[in-house]
Amino acid sequence: MTKVGVAGYGVIGQRLADGVAAQGDMELVGVADVAPTLPVRALAERGMPYNLFTAMPEKKNLLTDAGIPVSGTLEELVEEADIMLDATSAGIGAKNKEIYLKHNTKAVFQGGEKNDVADVFFHGYANYEKGVGADYLKLTSCNTTGLIRAIDAIDRAVGVPKTAMTIIRRVADPGDYHRGLTNALKMEHAPSHQAVD
């Protein structure tokens, strides 16, 4: 059974943890976060179905003072896991990679990280074979993932030499007020990171 850890228990991390916990061939060792955010508080209110590890030991008191039990540190989670799913904010995954390397733990990074964090810039539909056997994968962003599925399917059928598109998306997920207007639309500068991806 593959032992999996999740770093970052936000919008993406919650989905990853729930997905891993539902698999018959995986064991969720735990999730790591830094503060008693809304998802972490909800985890506690659900009776802690997943072990919570502090990503910043020096700030463990933020969690314990809020009455949230802590099972250990991010490094202890990494030591126990075979693979880490890193859903932390952009740039944090690259810092976490140092811990993953130290413990020879494989990792999959979310789309906000820079491409050089991983061996393969990975999309399960378009280049699955390149990811097989790699130790570190970086996933495309959620918007890019959807675009790649559609464009790749058409490309395989009839060929797509070039695409031009406009992406209209919300600025931030509910609860992520620090990223900007929640549930609002914003026109991005061109090219966006989706174009580069």
Name each model-derived stretch.
Residues 1-171:
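N-terminal Rossmann-like NAD(P) cofactor-binding subdomain of oxidoreductases
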Residues 160-197:
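Catalytic core of tubulin tyrosine ligase-like
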